[in-house]
Amino acid sequence: MCVICFVKALVRVFKIYLTASYTYPFRGWPVAFRWDDVRAVGRSSSHRALTCAAAAAGVWLLRDETLGGDALGRPPRGARSQAQCLLQQLRELPGQLASYALAHSLGRWLVYPGSVSLMTRALLPLLQQGQERLVERYHGRRAKLVACDGNEIDTMFMDRRQHPGSHVHGPRLVICCEGNAGFYEMGCLSAPLEAGYSVLGWNHPGFGSSTGVPFPQHDANAMDVVVEYALHRLHFPPAHLVVYGWSVGGFTATWATMTYPELGALVLDATFDDLVPLALKVMPHSWKGLVVRTVREHFNLNVAEQLCCYPGPVLLLRRTQDDVVSTSGRLRPLSPGDVEGNRGNELLLRLLEHRYPVVMAREGRAVVTRWLRAGSLAQEAAFYARYRVDEDWCLALLRSYRARCEEELEGEEALGPHGPAFPWLVGQGLSSRRRRRLALFLARKHLKNVEATHFSPLEPEEFQLPWRL
């Protein structure tokens, strides 16, 4: 055999090896990381995920510690007799059964269509091509993670830390949370990956090769083991982790930053504040009571509530042609420039009202609401310019307030990983005009408009890290 033929044969064998590495049945893969692998190094109790038994009870148990609410199923307070409790349970039983049946049939297919086996089979060639591209072009490393509920999570890691010219973005890891019909093989990770960041993609339980059924509690368990894998096996410091959630992925993204507040940043793309308004939009009006109950008990994607629990930098990407997360109209095409019904608007208002309640009182909320109605980048810029916002003055005011808080809280735990804890009472004593200008400044720093539809791939230059004061 000549030298050239030998080289060709060697290249062919190498390609066969690479192909086998990602087409080999996932169930036969060795486990790379388990949720309890970090117990030996003293895992913090505040990062407790759901146990297998607790997973069946829902994500509420997990939210109880962080949000400070009452856990679902906690015995009612007061002196109610056992007979009254039993009677109440019997009255609610038909509704609970109907809600359970809807959630485990049509509901799950509507909320997580990517888990339908027929869709997975139809997309299998594209998924294999996507894996091939990530492995061969970006040297992706596939790994199997096991969550606390026993689900096996399929992940792909692209390490850009040693990539030439990646000294700016490469040291940061972007954990990508896909939508309800997204897979890491062909999902939202392409934008941060092409922008030069290290990227960790994963599939929801029941999506692709990941096992299990996609319910919020199982999604939270999967996200928990993914974050632990990034911290303890891939060895990225918490401050270098950026969580990026697209669409329904905003739930797991906000859950991660709520549970791990020391993570570096959060980017939410084309997501919403709450699932109930969107569910009511597509379901019959006569089903309203059943739909609300089903969502609250089985698909409580409370993105806004979880978002307000994260103290770090946040950027919201609102797509101006997005008809999926919009409640404008009912099952009709979205008219150009109609962004008033986009649920990302409520997400921004909830965030700003939590962080800056004085600024967002009355005049502040009103002016931000009008600014959010701008249907194009030109209209947005014109509205902003009309109020003559002095950005230097806004920055100086915010930095001065933060410095005073840091002096008062020096050495105390209240300072937190991102500085003084929210809410900030900055803006007291300001005139109405100045509060409006400060509110507009903060809104523009936390939300960026992208002229695209819900399913359009995000351009690499559109993916940016959030603003830091």
Swiss-Prot record:
Keywords: Hydrolase, Lipid metabolism, Phospholipid metabolism. It is an enzyme of class 3 (hydrolase). It comes from the Eukaryota. It catalyses: a 1,2-diacyl-sn-glycero-3-phospho-L-serine + H2O = a 2-acyl-sn-glycero-3-phospho-L-serine + a fatty acid + H(+); a 1-acylglycerol + H2O = glycerol + a fatty acid + H(+); 1-(9Z-octadecenoyl)-glycerol + H2O = glycerol + (9Z)-octadecenoate + H(+). The lineage of its organism: Eukaryota, Metazoa, Chordata, Craniata, Vertebrata. GO terms for biological process: monoacylglycerol catabolic process; phosphatidylserine catabolic process. It comes from Homo sapiens (Human). The active site is at S247, D322, H418. This is ABHD16B. Residues 174-298 form the AB hydrolase-1 domain. Pfam families: Abhydrolase_1. The keyword Hydrolase applies. Belongs to the AB hydrolase superfamily. ABHD16 family.
